[in-house]
Curated annotation (Swiss-Prot):
EC number: 2.7.7.48
GO cellular component, one term: mitochondrion
CDD domains: RT_LTR
Name of the molecule in the record: RNA-directed DNA polymerase homolog
Keyword Transferase among record annotations: yes
Organism whose genome encodes this protein: Oenothera berteroana (Bertero's evening primrose)
Broad class of enzyme this protein falls into: transferase
SUPFAM superfamilies linked to this entry: DNA/RNA polymerases
């Protein structure tokens, strides 16, 4: 199905030049595959627009200003394209899901992989999915 939606792309090169880079390590895809090799069940949850759930630090909103023919706008949430967006988002998801990491959840970029290794039971996998779903911080914003 063709999705006809707009995705804003803002040139943040000037902001990037003065941004202190977050050195948060992005997981290696081969580590992810090693982790999932024994999984009987797994589900990939795409946290689409996940960045839009992360609040910009108070006072930093003017740094995200974009000017259009309709006026100038500041983001209150983290837009796609900021240098530290991916690291910030991964760090947040790892903090929210800390107690489940490497038990039945892996965070990879803006995706969550929920997996079941120790049981062939679909019922057990569904329980894992519910636990993740009930981590409300993932699905709600201020």
């Amino acid at each position: 199905m063709l999705e006809l939606s707009l995705r804003m792309c803002i040139d943040y090169r000037a902001l990037t030049k003065v941004t202190i880079k977050n050195k948060y390590p992005i997981p290696r895809v081969d580590d992810l595959f090693d982790r999932l090799a024994q999984a009987t069940w797994f589900t990939k949850l795409d946290l689409r627009s996940g960045y839009w759930q992360v609040r910009i630090a108070k006072g930093d909103e003017p740094k995200t200003t974009c000017v259009t023919r309709y006026g100038s706008f500041e983001f209150r949430v983290m837009p796609f394209g900021l240098t530290n967006a991916l690291a910030t988002f991964c760090n947040l998801m790892n903090n929210v899901l800390y107690e489940y990491l490497d038990h039945f959840v892996v965070v990879y970029l803006d995706d969550l992989v929920v997996y079941t290794i120790y049981s062939n039971s679909l019922h057990e996998h569904i329980k894992h999915l519910r636990v993740v779903r009930e981590s409300k911080e993932i699905f709600e914003s201020d």
